[in-house]
Amino acid sequence: MNLEAQISKIVEANGAALYDIETANEFDETIYRVLITKTGGVNLDLCATISNELSPFLDVHPPMNGHYRLEVSSPGIERKLSKPIHFQNAIGEKVKVKLLGGDKLKGVLKAADDKGITVETKQGEESYSYSDLGTVKTYFEW
């Protein structure tokens, strides 16, 4: 079983689901970020519990060479969409899309399947395959 599957098992044992795993460098520090979701929301106690269970596991099965800081959190209201399941769960939400060619668009995610997405923009519905997409994020108008 690979590392992501093992992490997912630990997360699911606590009633949550693994959303994504990211590695980031912030302020000369490497962060290994485990993003989780749960129906009804994610709270600090859940993040702490999962972090406390993941930490000894990752001490034995390090996710990378060198020092890192483990962070367990929700992906947030404005979150990156990268897997087909992320897009399928975000149907009806507002998204910002940056295409690989550099073009950008905003709209409402209308559909998503295993091949691509459809976004309702001011110009109408536009469909893209996943291979056309650069970065896609949900956004919230404050």
UniProtKB/Swiss-Prot annotation:
Biological processes, Gene Ontology terms: ribosomal small subunit assembly; translation
Signal peptide start and end residues: none
The organism's place on the tree of life at top rank: Bacteria
InterPro entries on file: Ribosome_maturation_RimP (IPR003728), RimP_C (IPR028998), RimP_C_sf (IPR036847), RimP_N (IPR028989), RimP_N_sf (IPR035956)
GO cellular component terms given for this protein: cytosol
Keywords: Cytoplasm, Ribosome biogenesis
Keyword Cytoplasm: yes
Location relative to the cell: Cytoplasm
UniProt-listed Pfam families: DUF150_C, RimP_N
Entry's family note: Belongs to the RimP family.
NCBIfam families for this protein: PRK00092.4-1
Entry function: Required for maturation of 30S ribosomal subunits.
Protein name: Ribosome maturation factor RimP
Gene name, Swiss-Prot/TrEMBL: rimP
